[in-house]
Amino acid sequence: MATLKINDLHVQVEGKEILKGVSFSMSEGETVALLGPNGHGKSTLFNAIMGHPRYKITKGSIYLDDVDLTHMTTDERARAGLFLGLQNPAEVPGVINSDFLRAAVNATSEERVSTYKFYKLLDSATKELKMPFDLATRSLNEGFSGGEKKRNEILQLMLLNPKIAMLDEIDSGLDVDAIQTVADVINKLEGEGKGFLVISHYARLFDLIKPTRAIVMVNGKIVLDGDPSLIKRIDQTGYEFIKAELGINIEKEENKMNEVSIGSCAVRESIKK
């Protein structure tokens, strides 16, 4: 069973320290909710774990089992078994979705997947996600609705078959039925032993996927790591109790960094704007 271990992680973006000593671990078969106010380091943590070059690790380490990922490239981390479902998937005109997905699958597979096998997998996955198959013939995310983009991220997840998946607000832009469909897929994959680290600001998704644990980030640090009851408490009362009970002042949200993410982490080097 694969275990992701983050130890004393410090991360800077454009010279500003965002993460200030983050440590935690999680394993396959576990679903962890990552909570916290906007602008307090959750997405930065995901990008740093995945190896986005704009996020500079100044201290600490990232391990998947006994493999040190800290200085690996994004595509190397994807091959090791990590996946990041993006909050704002970019549109890439001229790159056909199915070609992109097949390149991503082959980039992370030990053996090259034949065209026949790939399209068989693609057909099965799109049906499970209740996606129209013609999305596969269009340019990557171009003209996709917000919900279609998010389903396309889950489609990548299903095809790439990682050990640990990080999902950044995967439920935003989805209607009630689509959230249920995505939750069903997450629950199925968790049952097969996949690990999930999930950011969401809505309790509905967590009600459906039932995390085993909840982590709260404030001011670039983990301030709470406990059971799922934290999710309900925060949904009902917000984050004010953190100041009252832990004596931690919640800094105001600053302007978010503009993130540029192109497609799947598995083929980051293959596609240039």
What positions do the PLM features span?
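ABC ATPase NBD Q-loop/coupling interface
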Residues: 61-77, 141
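Conserved hydrophobic segment flanking the Walker A/P-loop of ABC-type ATPase nucleotide-binding domains
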Residues: 26-28
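Conserved beta-strand-loop-alpha-helix hinge in the C-terminal portion
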Residues: 217, 221-244
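The feature captures the beta-strand-to-loop junction immediately N-terminal to the Walker
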Residues: 35-37
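Helix-to-loop junction immediately C-terminal to a conserved catalytic motif
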Residues: 50
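Conserved structural motif at the start of ABC-family nucleotide-binding domains
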Residues: 4-6, 19-21
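Walker B catalytic motif
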Residues: 169-170
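ABC-family P-loop ATPase nucleotide-binding domains
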Residues: 90-163
